[in-house]
């Protein structure tokens, strides 16, 4: 697709997907126009949340387009069987990160819970289904845990526990009624869990993505797996690029790389490229913290649950090797 200098901050041309990402973030859209909010080294709230509101236009079926995202564009780093979308100023050596690995280690399940699953943006939901409509609190948002991202977390918790991992699933709402400040609220809750359960070594923050083109087209990441329409899953890794202290972010990247490889070895195409961001997203709290995006607001809940089940089964295989 044709690119123009005006598409990018600093006069650099942006790809199709980068323009979608700009459209999706209020802060990044400000940056594109030359207006940004600056942070400090002490800033703990991810910059993406400062002043951001979850405003999405209503979804109409004729504006939804299916895509399977593979990371084949020039903006992606592909090495070691890994695909990465690097949205920082860092030069990332995937081979060196893979070699150094992650020090994540769990005590046996009998000792206590190992993983905390939560949802900073708890009301994030999926496309409306005429057969099972839900009451919206905003476009593709609902406080009903049977239809929002909490339902996805419930399914992942079930499979993790079925496979032998011990999980706490936090079903509290952190983005309602007030969206801004959600990361501070989920961080405070996570700190309480960590204090109460010292065996917790991993925090997984599950979200759903939102991919919207400049013309209003909603893109949903999806593929067919064993005849089932399945939402793709994206791992998001934070960093210290925005100035906050996060010296071991590369360990989180190494873990994400393991998970991406496992997903795509079992179900090719299930994992979208890993995204590396400038903010920490509270991932500094444990060695195993990651943010996971299951589908987007264009996907149906059934598609998201299909992707969540496969993610859970593949991730559990990796995580169980770190027990003992």
Where are these regions (language model features)?
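Solvent-exposed loop/turn segments at secondary-structure junctions
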Residues: 122-125, 173-177, 208-213, 240-243, ...
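Extracytoplasmic
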Residues: 101, 110-113, 198-201, 228-232, ...
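Active-site-adjacent substrate-binding region
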Residues: 248-275
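Non-catalytic propeptide/linker segments at domain boundaries
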Residues: 7, 11-120, 125-129
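Active-site-adjacent mobile loop/cap segments within catalytic or ligand-binding domains
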Residues: 271-324
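A short, glycine/acidic-enriched catalytic loop
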Residues: 136-139, 211-247
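Glycine- and acidic-residue-enriched helix-capping/strand-helix junction motifs
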Residues: 128-151
């Amino acid at each position: 697709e044709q690119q123009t200098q005006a598409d990018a901050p600093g006069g650099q041309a942006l790809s199709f997907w980068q323009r979608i990402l700009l459209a999706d973030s209020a802060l990044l859209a400000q940056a594109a126009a030359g207006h940004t909010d600056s942070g400090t080294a002490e800033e703990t709230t991810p910059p993406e949340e400062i002043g951001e509101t979850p405003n999405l236009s209503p979804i109409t079926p004729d504006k939804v387009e299916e895509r399977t995202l593979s990371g084949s564009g020039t903006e992606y780093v592909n090495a070691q069987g890994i695909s990465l979308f690097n949205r920082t100023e860092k030069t990332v050596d995937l081979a060196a990160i893979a070699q150094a690995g992650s020090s994540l280690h769990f005590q046996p399940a009998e000792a206590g819970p190992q993983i905390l699953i939560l949802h900073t943006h708890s009301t994030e939901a999926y496309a409306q289904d005429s057969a099972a409509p839900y009451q919206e609190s905003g476009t593709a948002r609902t406080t009903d845990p049977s239809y929002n991202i909490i339902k996805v977390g419930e399914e992942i918790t079930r499979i993790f526990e079925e496979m032998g991992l011990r999980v706490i699933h936090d079903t509290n709402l952190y983005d309602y009624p007030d969206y801004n400040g959600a990361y501070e609220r989920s961080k405070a809750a996570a700190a309480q869990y960590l204090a109460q359960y010292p065996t917790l070594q991993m925090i997984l923050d599950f979200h759903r993505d939102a991919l919207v083109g400049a013309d209003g087209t909603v893109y949903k990441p999806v593929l067919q797996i064993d005849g089932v329409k399945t939402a793709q899953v994206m791992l998001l890794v934070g960093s210290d690029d925005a100035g906050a202290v996060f010296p071991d972010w590369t360990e989180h990247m190494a873990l994400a790389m393991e998970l991406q490889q496992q997903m795509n070895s079992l179900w090719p195409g299930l994992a979208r490229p890993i995204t590396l961001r400038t903010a920490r997203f509270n991932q500094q709290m444990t060695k195993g913290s990651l943010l996971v995006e299951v589908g987007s607001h264009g996907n149906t809940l059934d598609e998201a649950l299909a992707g969540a089940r496969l993610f859970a089964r593949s991730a559990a295989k990796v995580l169980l090797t770190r027990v003992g």
